Amino acid sequence: MAGVRLVDVWKVFGEVTAVREMSLEVKDGEFMILLGPSGCGKTTTLRMIAGLEEPSRGQIYIGDKLVADPEKGIFVPPKDRDIAMVFQSYALYPHMTVYDNIAFPLKLRKVPRQEIDQRVREVAELLGLTELLNRKPRELSGGQRQRVALGRAIVRKPQVFLMDEPLSNLDAKLRVRMRAELKKLQRQLGVTTIYVTHDQVEAMTMGDRIAVMNRGVLQQVGSPDEVYDKPANTFVAGFIGSPPMNFLDAIVTEDGFVDFGEFRLKLLPDQFEVLGELGYVGREVIFGIRPEDLYDAMFAQVRVPGENLVRAVVEIVENLGSERIVHLRVGGVTFVGSFRSESRVREGVEVDVVFDMKKIHIFDKTTGKAIF
């Protein structure tokens, strides 16, 4: 097995910079997620690691081997990188059986027939495909086809798996099941895996670490807890989480409040101290709080002083059964709360809303970078 390292990698297509100053280290055996919206550069990054695209600048290492460095004229072709890719499309050969589809990469490498048979059957057992080995792809469900595509990658025993949105063609229920299966499989095999997705749920539930990208730039790398609880900037904070984080413009006042114009909230002493030391008192900031950190006061699980209780008008209630997504307004300020199912708020009525000030985030108004 091997880790993967990118050092100051750029990719430019004409006048478009698809990837900019990308430096990332994926540890041996790690499940790394490349997460971001469409067009952020995540698939281009994966293709450069695979050798399907050549970087415009920078170095790429697989294990200790330098596989790409334009300045030194080094570019190792995909077949010599000991990687296996799984794509969004299953790319199975329709005229071949499941057995032959899985065996195909080994036949190309002229592996002895007996070894091919042994490895194919081992992989089929691992993926629950043993009973399907004689079937053709058209006779399989979407989930079964995806497992065959995975089997074809696994059977090669590569150093690194590269996966480009492999679950996006599956229906929602099957995606949930395949997420768990993929994570379990990666743990069993212990193979370094780099997985591209735009789906934050896939990223949060599957990855050891998540690399969040936007507009070709790496925004933050961290564990699911780190990128959720301590986002580096407003992009990461808003991209991860559903419903997304509330962002409100506010001014830090000299008496220790954040003032939204329509209402004020009392900062905790250590929060006000940090903002004071960094020169933010009297300045505009972006106040962030996740919907689950707002409570219907009747069911609040946190003890809150009166300064952090706000009376708001309920505009819309989305009943999800286990929770209620409540759209709220105070004058011209709007925000969203995720209330417990016991809350019976109705549209058009007023409700007292509790802000859990221990969970707030403050961002620089100009740069969007997190202050805390």
From Swiss-Prot:
<keyword id="KW-0479">Metal-binding</keyword>
<dbReference type="InterPro" id="IPR027417">
    <property type="entry name" value="P-loop_NTPase"/>
</dbReference>
<keyword id="KW-0813">Transport</keyword>
<feature type="binding site">
    <location>
        <begin position="36"/>
        <end position="43"/>
    </location>
    <ligand>
        <name>ATP</name>
    </ligand>
</feature>
<comment type="similarity">
    <text>Belongs to the ABC transporter superfamily. Maltose/trehalose importer (TC 3.A.1.1.7) family.</text>
</comment>
<dbReference type="InterPro" id="IPR003593">
    <property type="entry name" value="AAA+_ATPase"/>
</dbReference>
<feature type="domain" description="ABC transporter">
    <location>
        <begin position="4"/>
        <end position="240"/>
    </location>
</feature>
<dbReference type="GO" id="GO:0046872">
    <property type="term" value="F:metal ion binding"/>
</dbReference>
<dbReference type="InterPro" id="IPR003439">
    <property type="entry name" value="ABC_transporter-like_ATP-bd"/>
</dbReference>
<dbReference type="GO" id="GO:0055052">
    <property type="term" value="C:ATP-binding cassette (ABC) transporter complex, substrate-binding subunit-containing"/>
</dbReference>
<comment type="subunit">
    <text>Homodimer. The complex is composed of two ATP-binding proteins (MalK), two transmembrane proteins (MalG and MalF) and a solute-binding protein (MalE).</text>
</comment>
<dbReference type="InterPro" id="IPR040582">
    <property type="entry name" value="OB_MalK-like"/>
</dbReference>
<comment type="function">
    <text>Part of the ABC transporter complex MalEFGK involved in trehalose/maltose import. Responsible for energy coupling to the transport system.</text>
</comment>
<dbReference type="Pfam" id="PF17912">
    <property type="entry name" value="OB_MalK"/>
</dbReference>
<keyword id="KW-0067">ATP-binding</keyword>
<dbReference type="GO" id="GO:0015423">
    <property type="term" value="F:ABC-type maltose transporter activity"/>
</dbReference>
<protein>
    <recommendedName>
        <fullName>Trehalose/maltose import ATP-binding protein MalK</fullName>
        <ecNumber>7.5.2.1</ecNumber>
    </recommendedName>
</protein>
<dbReference type="GO" id="GO:0016887">
    <property type="term" value="F:ATP hydrolysis activity"/>
</dbReference>
<dbReference type="InterPro" id="IPR047641">
    <property type="entry name" value="ABC_transpr_MalK/UgpC-like"/>
</dbReference>
<dbReference type="Pfam" id="PF00005">
    <property type="entry name" value="ABC_tran"/>
</dbReference>
<dbReference type="InterPro" id="IPR008995">
    <property type="entry name" value="Mo/tungstate-bd_C_term_dom"/>
</dbReference>
<dbReference type="InterPro" id="IPR017871">
    <property type="entry name" value="ABC_transporter-like_CS"/>
</dbReference>
<dbReference type="InterPro" id="IPR012340">
    <property type="entry name" value="NA-bd_OB-fold"/>
</dbReference>
<dbReference type="GO" id="GO:0005524">
    <property type="term" value="F:ATP binding"/>
</dbReference>
<keyword id="KW-0547">Nucleotide-binding</keyword>
<dbReference type="InterPro" id="IPR015855">
    <property type="entry name" value="ABC_transpr_MalK-like"/>
</dbReference>
<keyword id="KW-0762">Sugar transport</keyword>
<keyword id="KW-1003">Cell membrane</keyword>
<keyword id="KW-1278">Translocase</keyword>
<keyword id="KW-0460">Magnesium</keyword>
<keyword id="KW-0472">Membrane</keyword>
